[in-house]
Amino acid sequence: MLENTNRTLTAAATRLRLYNTATHNTSEFKTVTPGHVGMYVCGATVQSSPHIGHIRAAIAFDVVRRWLLRLGYNVTFVRNVTDIDDKIIKKASENGQTWWQRAYIYEREFTEAYNTLGVMPPTVEPRATGHINDMVELIQRLIDRGHAYAIKSADGNPTGNVYFSVPSWQDYGALTHQNGNSDNNSDGSNGEEKASKSDKYNPIDPADASPDKHDARDFALWKAPCDFDQKDARWNTPFGAGRPGWHIECSAMSHRYLGDAFDIHGGGLDLRFPHHENEMAQTLAAGWKSANVWMHSAWVTAKGEKMSKSLGNGLSVPSVLAQKSAWVVRYALGGVQYRAMLEWSDQALNEAQSAYDRISNFLERAGRVIENQPDYAEVQGVDADNLPEDFTKAMNDDINVSGALAAIFTAIRSDNALLDDYAQSQNESQNDSIKSLIKTCVLQVRAMLDTLGLDPYSPQWRRNAQKSQDLCEDADNGASAEHKALESLIANQLEQRAIARAAKDFARADAIRDSLTAAGVVIEDCAQGSSWHLS
């Protein structure tokens, strides 16, 4: 789905409701600026290759963005890249690389994975190292306002360590309702109880264990060089040489690109605490406003355990793509509501493959009737007010993708019945009317699919089809090499059957039909001739 700045807000936009982590409830979505959404999503820490857990989060917020666009909003979507941190430096040193070489290599891998799985490029994709000055200015602002302090050596020189003073900010804990010492007291819905303050899912920054802190809850804004740091992994500042803490970059970059106030801040569930809690505190303490809505996508799990690099159970994107097409993998990762845990299994992939087969069979069958698939621009032109009510209702209910998919398959069942009517009708005038209706149905189905990033005829999937030869046919003539070969074989069989019927050799005609049926090919005879589709 493409973005543009000529959108008109739909009536459906007024009914969008989103769950806010900070309030623990679902409420009407209202924007800071009418008709515009500012959205910041925490992106990758590019220490190593992406796994499907990373991509699930990216797909989840890609769908949120696509729905906002379909509702008629203009969207500024910012997704950062963390290209400097402890793990990047350590792993680079272990592998004989500079930290920036490693970051560059894996940033490209993430970008390739996003592109392959149909995630729209962000409006802005800032790197942490490109915004050091913004971070330094923010840290100084916090010091000046009494919410941060720089550590000095015994002789009064800056050490390079700066900490946020948690006791100075009385509203600390507003996001997750914990103060850094207490147990997590979230309501536990949709797996939130698993994102506790300090465990294997939420490792604490080593800099936060420093004895120099004034309070145990204080956290690092700027970090002095460590023993394992490479010499160029530091910047000179008034606080001393060092590099950014874990949390400061997102406050600095979201403010840089979205201003003092914006609409949505997103990220994975494991970022709730401490990352987003600390980010909210330092942003508010700087005198800026926090995001209106905080959204968190749940994890991909394997046997009930979160997939992660640190736990060693993450499935790489290439390994999954070796099993199924990118479209199928995206469906499997994005086919549930974003706050629901997603248990990964072969069954999930097989169900996604079945969904692809049902969708592509319908679109191919309908495409033969209307002769050409609608242009992608036409699909984009279908706004939320012109989609089936059950789809719009599901998407407006906190992006309920499961309900939206149910609406799509309901539409496909109805549309297949319409195609049956067309195949059986011998009334030319009636068929013209049905044909026009079928095109409208195809536009709606493709617009719904495109909202989920799953329109097989979109430019994204057409490019992937040329690359992998395992997706749907392209918009002009139809298909992969395999499908073209299948079409040729079936066309030959239908021609032989037509010759047999003309010669009144009905036994041979029936035998051809039976052999095709046994192979999973459904033949439909009508006044205009015979057509086929896969069962």
Summary of predicted features, one role per range:
Residues L2-T5, K306, N313-S535:
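Structural preference for alpha-helix termini/caps and helix-kink/transition segments
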Residues L69, N115, I143-D144, M295, ...:
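Alpha-helix C-terminal capping/helix-coil junction sites
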Residues L2-Q47, D62, N133-R368:
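Alpha-helical recognition segments enriched in aromatics with Gly/Pro capping
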Residues T23-T26, V32-M120, L138, Q528-W532:
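N-terminal, positively charged nucleic-acid-binding surface of large information/translation enzymes
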Residues Y73, H147, V521:
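Short phosphate-binding/catalytic loops that engage adenosine nucleotides
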Residues A92-W99, T123-T129, G240, G268:
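The substrate-binding groove and active-site-proximal loops of carbohydrate-active enzymes
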Residues R56, G130, G245-E249, I399, ...:
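Aromatic- and histidine-enriched alpha-helix N-cap/loop-to-helix transition segments
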